[in-house]
Regions:
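Catalytic core of PPM/PP2C metal-dependent serine/threonine phosphatase domains
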Residues: 53, 62-123, 150-177, 239-242, ...
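Helix-loop-helix
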Residues: 51-81, 203-225
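Short glycine- and acidic-rich boundary segments immediately preceding or forming the N-terminal edge
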Residues: 1-13, 76-84, 136-159
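N-terminal entry segment of metal-dependent catalytic domains or homologous docking segments
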Residues: 1-57, 118, 165-174, 189, ...
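C-terminal catalytic subdomain
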Residues: 4-6, 15, 21, 105, ...
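Short amphipathic alpha-helical segments
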Residues: 40, 125-127, 196-199
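Residue-level marker for buried hydrophobic side chains located in beta-strands
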Residues: 27, 114, 183-185
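A short alpha->loop->secondary-structure connector
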Residues: 121-133
Length: 259
């Protein structure tokens, strides 16, 4: 199995999303945007982090094709620490970080992992399943002090940054290849189609199948422009008018579709 993908920045800023695809696997990352004036203790930015983490994950997946995805992620974060090359304070709670979504074909199974608010969505005979780590939805507050205090802590939320232990908190699972109809991985710049604009995931799959993954991003931009008033969360800070958006969509061979 292989994947088609698309990614686009939400503004003139560098794209802080990243996608890596190869035969039988896909990785989607969403770097956490740094607040202005926040001391991160790091000389690097989120765009650097997602590129390096993507490379670390690809290397770990190649080295351990049957290793659990949690261990793959832990190894990648551990390698990522060395790439800071001693120039950064890796104990800083605001160090650059990223969400993670991984899908890997393994024999007759497809394994998946999700950390923080990126998503894996698939459809089989049981219907559409959305795999998402929703712990950021229930924080007691969203100011920078509270978020920093609860990041990668029990009772808080978990991201890929400088602590390999975060990998053990990822949401993981497997689904049989047989009967798997459709699958995608995406950042929250794509899932806002369903969260805010109330499309069904079957609609998103349909756009991708008819016109390709870039058309899904085009749909996001149209909704962001035409219905910006829907971009709101109760009890949360303002939502970006335009966010970085990335997705990887499974392209199944004809023979696979008839298995």
């Amino acid at each position: 199995m292989d994947f088609a993908f698309a990614t686009a920045p939400g503004s003139e800023r560098p794209n802080e999303d990243h996608v890596v695809v190869s035969a039988g696997q896909a990785i989607v990352l969403d770097g956490v945007t740094q607040l202005p004036g926040l001391d991160t203790g790091c000389v690097h930015n989120p765009a650097w982090l997602v590129r390096e983490l993507g490379d670390c994950l690809a290397r770990a997946l190649a080295a351990g094709p049957t290793t659990s995805l949690q261990l793959i992620l832990a190894a990648a974060i551990d390698e990522l620490r060395t790439r800071h090359a001693g120039r950064c304070d890796l104990s800083n709670p605001h160090s650059p970080s990223s969400t993670v979504a991984i899908v890997r074909s393994r024999g007759e199974q497809v394994d998946y992992l999700v950390l923080c608010d990126s998503s894996v969505v698939y459809e089989n005979a049981d219907g559409v399943t959305v795999v998402r780590d929703d712990r950021t939805d229930t924080l007691p507050a969203y100011d920078r002090h509270t978020v920093g205090r609860l990041r990668n802590r029990p009772g808080g939320f978990w991201v890929a940054s400088t602590d390999p232990a975060a990998a053990a908190e990822a949401v993981t699972g497997s689904v049989a290849c047989s009967g798997l109809r459709r699958l995608l991985l995406c950042t929250d710049g794509i899932s806002r189609l369903t969260e805010f604009f109330k499309l069904a995931w079957t609609d998103v799959f349909g756009i991708a199948e008819r016109s390709g993954p870039h058309a899904v991003i085009d749909a996001v931009r149209r909704y962001e422009t035409d219905q910006p008033d829907l971009l709101a969360r109760v009890g949360r800070g303002p939502v970006k008018r335009h966010d970085d958006a990335t997705l990887a969509v499974l392209r199944r061979r004809t023979a696979d579709r008839h298995r």
